[in-house]
A protein has these predicted regions:
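Short amphipathic alpha-helix that is part of the acyltransferase structural core
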Residues: 1-38, 148-177
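Conserved donor-binding loop and adjoining core beta-sheet/short helix segment
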Residues: 8-11, 27, 31-101, 113, ...
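Acyl-donor-binding surface of acyltransferase catalytic domains
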Residues: 70, 82-150, 282-284
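Conserved hydrophobic beta-strand within the GNAT/NAT acetyltransferase core sheet
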Residues: 76-78, 109-112, 219, 253-257
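Active-site acidic-Proline motif in GNAT/NAT acetyltransferases
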Residues: 81-87, 212, 225-227, 231, ...
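Conserved acetyl-CoA-binding loop-helix of GNAT-fold acetyltransferases
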Residues: 86-99, 126, 221-224, 230-247, ...
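C-terminal "cap" of GNAT-fold acetyltransferases
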Residues: 136-158, 251, 256-262, 277-286
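Glycine/small-residue-rich hydrophobic helix-like segments
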Residues: 182-248
């Protein structure tokens, strides 16, 4: 069998449809819920080679995508058609992706591996990937949610809030300032996204963002400054955000949270979320 791998700076509508179909085939075969960030695939800048496609027998049989939020690492997600596995396709995709990262001076890759993917974990062991953390994808359920009251005001961001948002990213996510600025620039200007500041006593103490379209809303960038954690402010802000989205008629609300263990999910579960899937992240130095 022969196959061809090509690096792409942008993807055509046909390629996007083929990737969607490949994801569905792999998910059905493996009982997984692979994460490929379709929204990011649709909005590639065209500046860098970040998508790698493999064709054999006239169809797409493998895909690997790079997701670069800052210059310190590139997140990696990909898959190979069940009928074309164990033929070196993913290894070849990864080799091209690693070369693309090196050309950009990106020192490491962060692989997104579904918790139940035995093949993914075996691959990480084989190439020396080191476990870093886990993220839990959670959906808002129909059960009764806890009623939360308090003095947190959610205010939409304005242009003059830029430095405050950087400050919150640095302290709320323990992020280096340079990377916080780079991430903010990369994610700015998305018409589907809104960010609200958490205001207590006229001071910004946290933030929460929502990416929304006609069918779903995704909560992200949710943090509280360490000086104000443990006071219930995050719960208040999350509850207010959920209430607003439900009132707006949003049919599906989801979020992704990084936790060292599943017991840390209590805040989100108390607000009506349940765990749909989990991803483990593995780092590979280049």
């Amino acid at each position: 069998m022969t196959y061809t791998i090509t690096a792409r700076k942008t993807l055509t509508s046909g390629e996007l449809a083929q990737i969607k179909e490949l994801v569905a085939i792999c998910n059905e075969q493996d009982g997984l819920d692979l994460k490929v960030n379709p929204g990011m695939l649709e909005k590639r800048s065209g500046e860098h080679e970040e998508d790698f496609v493999c064709y054999a027998d006239g169809k797409l049989v493998g895909f690997l995508g790079l997701y670069v939020f800052h210059g310190g690492e590139a997140e990696v997600s990909g898959m190979v058609h069940p009928a074309y596995r164990r033929k070196g396709i993913f290894t070849a995709l990864q080799a091209q992706a690693a070369d693309a990262c090196r050309r950009r001076g990106i020192p490491s890759q962060l692989f997104i591996i579904q918790r139940d993917s035995q093949s993914g974990k075996s691959y990480m062991e084989r190439i020396g990937g080191e476990y870093q953390f886990s993220e839990y994808w959670m959906d808002l359920g129909e059960k009764q949610r806890a009623t939360v009251s308090g003095n947190v005001l959610l205010r939409p961001e304005i242009a003059s809030d830029y430095e405050t948002l950087i400050w919150l990213n640095v302290h709320g996510f323990q992020m280096e300032e340079e990377r916080a600025r780079e991430m903010a620039e990369n994610m700015a200007g998305d018409p589907k996204s809104t960010t609200h500041l958490m205001i207590v006593d006229d001071k910004a103490i946290g933030k929460i963002s929502v990416n929304k379209d006609e069918s779903k809303a995704f909560i992200y960038g949710f943090c509280v400054h360490p000086d104000h954690q443990g006071k219930g402010y995050g719960r208040q802000a999350l509850a207010q955000t959920i209430e607003r989205l439900v009132e707006e008629g949003c049919p599906q609300v989801s979020l992704e949270v990084a936790c060292e263990n599943s017991s840390a999910l209590g805040l989100y579960e108390s607000c009506g979320f349940f765990v749909k899937s989990a991803n483990d992240y593995y780092k590979l130095a280049l």
